[in-house]
Amino acid sequence: MARMSTNSTTPLSHIRNFSIVAHIDHGKSTLADRLIQTTGGLAEREMSEQVLDNMDIERERGITIKAQTVRLHYQANNGEKYILNLIDTPGHVDFAYEVSRSLSACEGSLLVVDASQGVEAQTLANVYQAIDNNHELVTVLNKIDLPAAEPDRIKEQIEEVIGIDASEAVLISAKTGLGIPDVLEAIVNRLPAPKSPGGDKAPLKALLVDSWYDTYLGVMVLVRIIDGVLTKGQTIRMMGTDAKYQVERVGVLTPKMVNVDSLGPGEIGFITASIKEVADTRVGDTITEDKRPTAQALPGFKPAQPVVFCGLFPVDAADFEDLRAAMGKLRLNDASFSFEMESSAALGFGFRCGFLGLLHLEIIQERLEREFDLDLIATAPSVVYKMFMTDGSERELHNPADMPDVVKISEIHEPWIRATILTPDDYLGGILKLCQDRRGIQIELTYVGTRAMLTYDLPLNEVVFDFYDRLKSISKGYASFDYTLTDHREGNLVKMSILVNGEPVDALSMMVHRTAAEKRGRDMCEKLKELIPKHMFKIPIQAAIGGNVIARETISALRKDVTAKCYGGDATRKRKLLDKQKAGKKRMRQFGKVEIPQEAFIAALKMGDE
């Protein structure tokens, strides 16, 4: 690790803290690479594509999951030297919490918009967050080297949709490096310097922006200093948890780790302090000095609440301990992922996990399978329902299999979301029908050029299943979608159980709206009929709500030709053999176990292929 002694007296006027706000794929990480390269943050040979996207899965999917940070040294055209702290934020809705905490550490943002595609739904969501944080915005139009780029039309669109002046937008191509110096000048000249109400003489007050686990150094904490100075050897206190630690190392990321003596007001850097788990560091917490604490903490952050739950089970029961260890390791780096043990009659031991959303679920599952070489089955995702019981108490339901007797429940409330969908108007009809089918309530429909912007209220339960995939297929991939949780509302919800040969299969039970139950039940039964192999006896597959069966399919029995050995035409002899076979099958149906293959589970849970 390089050693760099920096005097902590960088004047506030020469520091710029900024983040880059963009929709997935609009070139945010590539722009970050170019800024690092242009300011000499890494030598040419150390540059890799998307330097800040450390996980393989981030590079492959081309998305940023964990917020990363980098400190750049830049000599401006006016001859002055500046320190630029870039916090690279994720663009996807599931990681909105990572975005919000990154934004609160900065004073300004670069709004990156693809000059050929224009404003997308997530651009909007993140821009509004930046505006809520009182950020100064510099608009950057990327990919202007593409033949399809229309900078003038997109500038108008930005002014129309977002309502900010885009006349001075910087035109760049992050891929070729065109216009990057203009971006650096705009950061210095148009974004504000950080403010420090108390200056460097005040008691230490710092915002905990992020934390991650390093195999050699333990937990590393990313901090933004508001007041005071943070130095090595200091005893610090987390104001939220009241935990005390001694600072062992102070440094900055360039993006390599570089040790420094201290961090002063306005600066962003990292510390290590023998912290055992990432869970001990609550993001958004205020760090202060133990001996001379600051009077009041920074306005509080909420811990991330899991929104979607699903069971993860190892395909091979022997992998259970490996799965537990792997989840523990992922939890070290992702405080918003939660899990607890659960057992299922059909799938054995596994974990009930909580996620921020569907992409988060997919990424955790993919990381477990890829980085830890595990084979997993995920049960149908479900959301958190609030149950108001007849005795006046209130309970949360995370797993449909745990639902108490219906008689004890007076009403069930489900979470609703406010969704914003941007789509070319050719696909509007199909999307309106999709939202209608999913019990959506239309709030607003506006046109921006040839694109429609839809605002809908939807039950989250209808979205977690396959809404996003259906939206993409209806719009040929052109529609973009973003949502925020709004509230819980009462719903006519029922628990649908799937019975195979009269036995309920807990892993397939789900909460559905009463109006959609019959169709969902029929689809599920038909799918299982195709997937479960024939046995020596008939197998009924039923979907039931309480005691009422709402759909049924029957898998016919395999037949052995017991009359093959009868040569003569004696009918009574044949009858006797057939009756004997019938009695055997009846007995078998009572005691026979139906083996449901793993593929059947996996396919039945991917009901989105309808």
Swiss-Prot record:
One of its GO terms (molecular function) is ribosome binding. GO terms for cellular component: plasma membrane. PROSITE patterns: G_TR_1, G_TR_2. Residues 13-195 form the tr-type G domain. Its main location: membrane. Its EC number is 3.6.5.n1. It catalyses: GTP + H2O = GDP + phosphate + H(+). GO terms for biological process: positive regulation of translation. It is a peripheral membrane protein. Keywords: Cell inner membrane, Cell membrane, GTP-binding, Hydrolase, Membrane, Nucleotide-binding, Protein biosynthesis. It is found in: Cell inner membrane. It is an enzyme of class 3 (hydrolase). Gene3D superfamilies: 3.30.70.240, Elongation factor 4, C-terminal domain, Elongation Factor G (Translational Gtpase), domain 3, P-loop containing nucleotide triphosphate hydrolases, Translation factors. GTP binds at residues 25-30, 142-145. The keyword Cell inner membrane applies. Belongs to the TRAFAC class translation factor GTPase superfamily. Classic translation factor GTPase family. LepA subfamily. Required for accurate and efficient protein synthesis under certain stress conditions. May act as a fidelity factor of the translation reaction, by catalyzing a one-codon backward translocation of tRNAs on improperly translocated ribosomes. Back-translocation proceeds from a post-translocation (POST) complex to a pre-translocation (PRE) complex, thus giving elongation factor G a second chance to translocate the tRNAs correctly. Binds to ribosomes in a GTP-dependent manner. This is Elongation factor 4. It comes from Rhizobium leguminosarum bv. trifolii (strain WSM2304).
